[in-house]
């Protein structure tokens, strides 16, 4: 049974901002196409910033850098164009039985890239997502799309995991949800404390995972993770 399907709108006018769409049409909500005049203004702002920082924009390799930079930003934040409500949900064989449950569904590692909303610098890593289905499931590939939909925005690591867990809870109403993320943050590697190889880990537990330590251990073991090195949120 298809669920969470909304009418999609697109705008074909203006500048095509993405060469390769990262999300299929079934997850598209809108396109952030803008006019050529608006794009030109963004280029001018980017050029002003680069010039102030000392970049020579008159060389053959840098004269198109402002344009490439703006396009790269739209590509890196394409998650704003997607909508998790457009993911198709299927029924399981559990019909009204509160104790009917499936085995754990675990997907990972799921590589992701995001932009920190504090400094607009990248952070990147991988995610593991698991849930114990009740009456609804989604295709395992959709877990990957869900992570990347929320990651390809200006965000923070904690929010990405929270949004994935919240969305699965609303869509599937499963017995439990587990989300683990680990990432390198360039805002700590390139600036500030300038630590070369810190790895930030966050975990999110819902339902049965939150109340059952053995389920958490089973999830972490299946993912090849150390249970004593994660920070729960």
Sequence positions of predicted segments:
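A domain-level signal for the structural core that forms small-molecule/cofactor-binding pockets
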Residues: 1-233
């Amino acid at each position: 049974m298809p669920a969470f399907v909304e009418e999609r709108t697109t705008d074909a006018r203006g500048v095509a901002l993405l060469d390769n769409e990262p999300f299929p049409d079934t997850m598209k909500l809108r396109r952030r196409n803008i006019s050529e005049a608006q794009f030109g203004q963004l280029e001018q702002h980017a050029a002003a910033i680069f010039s102030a920082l000392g970049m020579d924009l008159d060389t053959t390799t840098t004269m198109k850098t402002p344009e490439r930079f703006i396009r790269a930003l739209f590509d890196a934040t394409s998650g704003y164009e997607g909508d998790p409500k457009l993911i198709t949900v299927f029924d399981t064989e559990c019909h009204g039985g509160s104790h009917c449950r499936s085995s754990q569904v675990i997907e990972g590692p799921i590589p992701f890239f995001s932009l920190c909303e504090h400094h607009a610098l990248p952070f990147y890593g991988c995610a593991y997502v698991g849930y114990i289905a009740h009456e609804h499931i989604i295709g395992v590939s959709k877990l990957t799309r869900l992570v990347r939909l929320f990651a390809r925005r200006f965000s923070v690591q904690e929010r990405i995991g929270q949004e994935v867990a919240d969305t699965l809870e609303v869509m599937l109403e499963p017995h439990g949800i587990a989300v683990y993320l680990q990432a390198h943050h360039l805002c700590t590697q390139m600036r500030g404390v300038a630590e070369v190889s810190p790895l930030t880990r966050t975990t999110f537990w819902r339902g049965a995972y939150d109340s059952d330590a053995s389920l958490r251990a089973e999830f972490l073991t299946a993912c090849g993770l150390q249970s004593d090195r994660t920070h729960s949120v």
